[in-house]
UniProtKB/Swiss-Prot annotation:
GO terms for biological process: apoptotic process; positive regulation of cytokine production; positive regulation of interleukin-1 beta production; protein autoprocessing; pyroptotic inflammatory response; regulation of apoptotic process; regulation of inflammatory response. Heterotetramer that consists of two anti-parallel arranged heterodimers, each one formed by a 20 kDa (Caspase-1 subunit p20) and a 10 kDa (Caspase-1 subunit p10) subunit. May be a component of the inflammasome, a protein complex which also includes PYCARD, CARD8 and NLRP2 and whose function would be the activation of pro-inflammatory caspases. Component of the AIM2 PANoptosome complex, a multiprotein complex that drives inflammatory cell death (PANoptosis). Both the p10 and p20 subunits interact with MEFV. Interacts with CARD17P/INCA and CARD18. The keyword Membrane applies. The active site is at H235, C284. Pfam families: CARD (PF00619), Peptidase_C14 (PF00656). It comes from Felis catus. This is Caspase-1.
Amino acid sequence: MADKVLKGKRKQFINSVGMGTVNGLLDELFEKNVLNQEEMERVKCENATVMDKARALIDSVLRKGPRACQIFICHICEEDTHLAETLGLSSSPQSGNSQNTTDSEVAFPPLPASVNNMPGPAEPEESVDALKLCPHENFVKLCKQRAEEIYPIKERKDRTRLALIICNTTFDHLSLRKGADLDVAGMRRLLTDLGYSVHIKEELTAKDMESELRAFAARPEHKSSDSTFLVFMSHGILSGICGTKYSAEGDPDVLAYDTIFQIFNNRNCLSLKDKPKVIIVQACRGENLGELLISDSPAAPMDSTSQMGSSLSQVGDNLEDDAIYKVHVEKDFIAFCSSTPHHVSWRDVNKGSLFITQLITCFQKYSWCFHLEEVFRKVQQSFEKPNVRAQMPTIERLSMTRYFYLFPGH
């Protein structure tokens, strides 16, 4: 089938296609009623690079089924013979285009037994880098069996989910964050697939970041939403996220983590009361390497435990303050940071950050059957054995009182 053929060629297409062919495909797919005007404009306007446009285009077509994929393949074969030869494509539906599909499937291992043993249907069949959708029977079963334990989600036709990505790449006094564009593109695609309207803000000072957060918290769409995601990508220190003017010697241009929680708590953002607020942070939190050589010495590193003690003290203080309110000031939050306090996070300049890459992969593989905390735990497990560079993602400031299932596809 043409859809299976195209899945096998996806990565090669993204890396090989030119802008002229992308535009030609968009026109062809629009004329053949495969894409509507809005979908065509979204590919053109919401993606900065040719690769991003190509990725958005082929993913849209794959979701449309075999007929759409065959139109896509035929256009390439007729209008860009060099690309067709590079991809090994033929316009004949009966051709042996799918040879590499098997190779692609073989190259990636099946899901772990823990996933395959989950009750309900077998794992949905999706391409290895596509979001697996939750089968309807799983969705209905979980909603009935765990109604009192999970956060309710709104109907797709009624909800207006929003997500915000803030990414700083270029700084006045700090190094360029090469590869950050890959993180932004990957997270935007993931959150869009999960049903969120994604807003992206880049190159901001701490003051600008705070202003954008306050404006985002005030958006009326949150009233008819069931959750939100806040994603931060920047240089960072222990206390917060660096703005573009940060200087260790001079300008303390830092957005404090506390500020983020204050803006979205129940005192300041009632529209998101009792709704999951997910904070993702890709940033260093210090300068220490996240690895050490174990010896027989009884001495133990103290930085993480001292941080834990500080956190416990803050929690105790918060409980006393919260007692005077009828609702908790801070609830339904979860923060997932790319490293433990005082330690660095690693980024591949050609592939993006290790944390965001694994985060996207685990969402794609597991969010159809696992709740959010379990998905995050899968990310942590992928870092459990230190590789060339060590870091350990950390769940922090967790105040969610229920399980948050994303139910992709619903």
